[in-house]
């Protein structure tokens, strides 16, 4: 079917808007992609995939790669920045810097929250899902930069966004589930209850959605590759929402 002039104009306008949005996103990230599809994959949640597309077309494989690239680059940064620190001290600093909450903070500072591509999950679930996968998306973007521009480009991104954090005073690492439980006890509330809401994905690569409940409070949900990981995300979401201090461990 031949497109009418009006349809052609709308198509060009839509393409131009998409190009402008990509350019703005690249500017915030600080890397111009030779292959923009890598960036799009890095910000695409599995729920946004059309029928017939593989889970590998979402951010998850890039997240795996980016996680290891981040660990390598930050390890190198720590090795040179703290020449008198022993292996144990370096490991603790590394764990704090690469935890999901740290990655999510970087993603927030870059304004990536609204760039995540999700399927139709409803406004309430949309907001929860965006927050729960923000750290994963940051790692996926690192993976995309690595594939597109190599180690040097990925290292530049990490150094630009992690150097200042590396020199901040360390905070004690605490499990968000422990923080939430202690806060609940201080409020005279019972122990938080975690329940599995949904399990999706194949047996070898499951995704768990878990909710945490406390009387008088709206449930908070988290998503992770294991029940425990999802529980920690859910606890972190409730901690952030209720303004609880002390949840620092990813």
Swiss-Prot record:
CDD domains: DSRM_RNAse_III_family, RIBOc
Biased composition (Basic residues): 1-15
Subcellular location per the Swiss-Prot or TrEMBL entry: Cytoplasm
One GO CC term on file: cytosol
Residue span of region Disordered: 1-21
Primary location: cytoplasm
UniProt key word 4Fe-4S: no
EC number(s) recorded for this UniProt protein: 3.1.26.3
Catalytic activity, as annotated: Endonucleolytic cleavage to 5'-phosphomonoester
Catalytic residue list: 67, 139
Self-association and partners: Homodimer.
Function: Digests double-stranded RNA. Involved in the processing of primary rRNA transcript to yield the immediate precursors to the large and small rRNAs (23S and 16S). Processes some mRNAs, and tRNAs when they are encoded in the rRNA operon. Processes pre-crRNA and tracrRNA of type II CRISPR loci if present in the organism.
Entry's family note: Belongs to the ribonuclease III family.
Protein name per the record: Ribonuclease 3
Species: Bradyrhizobium diazoefficiens (strain JCM 10833 / BCRC 13528 / IAM 13628 / NBRC 14792 / USDA 110)
Gene: rnc
